[in-house]
């Protein structure tokens, strides 16, 4: 199958740019909370951006986050969302988009196979296994620009985890109306 991606920031004289990428099979899902294979993950990594991304040296660096603060005990992370970042429809990317996406993946009704990737977060495993509430999951959008996350234990590689596709944001307003269909990275999927 061939995917077509549009890069809204780089356009030809007709105002369009398309990048065709040949992949071996159709993605299982383009929903960050449902993707469970390398093909889906590859497409998501090209069309969504998490709080962090892994650079060419294999190290995490800021993605949607412009600033990352860690508490002295290593159990609380505060992420500041970059100014000016938008979804492909022009809506701003907010801290609420991350909170919504992570709790969506943890909701046992959604059967996210990779929800366990979020179990580092306080209350996440209990919520996903039905022994706790999603309201008790310690991820909170303090405001549009600030996401606070409390972990069960110090997890020095947590910023690397936030580059994984299960940690990508979802535009709640659009997802609840249409399902996933917006992207917050350089490219958007046009067809596959």
Where would I find each of the regions flagged by the language model?
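Short, low-complexity disordered leader/linker segments with a strong preference
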Residues: 1-18, 59
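Solvent-exposed, polar/charged alpha-helical surfaces in well-ordered, non-transmembrane soluble domains
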Residues: 28, 45, 49, 66, ...
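Second-shell loop/turn segments in exported
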Residues: 34-35, 81-92, 136-137, 181
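Sec-exported extracytoplasmic/periplasmic mature domains
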Residues: 52, 56, 73, 86, ...
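Aromatic- and charge-enriched surface segment that lines or borders ligand/interaction sites
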Residues: 67-114, 148
């Amino acid at each position: 199958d061939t995917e077509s991606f549009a890069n809204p920031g780089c356009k030809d004289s007709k105002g369009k740019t398309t990048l065709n990428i040949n992949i071996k099979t159709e993605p299982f899902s383009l929903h960050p909370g449902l993707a469970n294979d390398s093909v889906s993950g590859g497409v998501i990594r090209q069309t969504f951006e998490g709080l962090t991304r892994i650079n060419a040296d294999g190290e995490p660096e800021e993605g949607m986050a412009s600033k990352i603060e860690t508490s002295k005990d290593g159990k609380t992370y505060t992420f500041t969302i970059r100014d000016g970042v938008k979804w492909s429809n022009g809506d701003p990317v907010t801290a609420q988009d991350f909170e919504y996406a992570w709790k969506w993946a943890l909701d046992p009704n959604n059967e996210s196979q990779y929800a366990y990737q979020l179990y580092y977060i306080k209350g996440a495993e209990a919520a996903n296994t039905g022994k706790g509430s999603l309201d008790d999951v310690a991820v909170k959008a303090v405001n549009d620009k600030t996401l606070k996350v409390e972990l069960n234990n110090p997890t020095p590689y947590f910023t690397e985890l936030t580059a994984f596709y299960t940690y990508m944001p979802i535009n709640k307003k659009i997802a609840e109306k249409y399902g996933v269909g917006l992207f917050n990275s350089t490219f958007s999927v046009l067809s596959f």
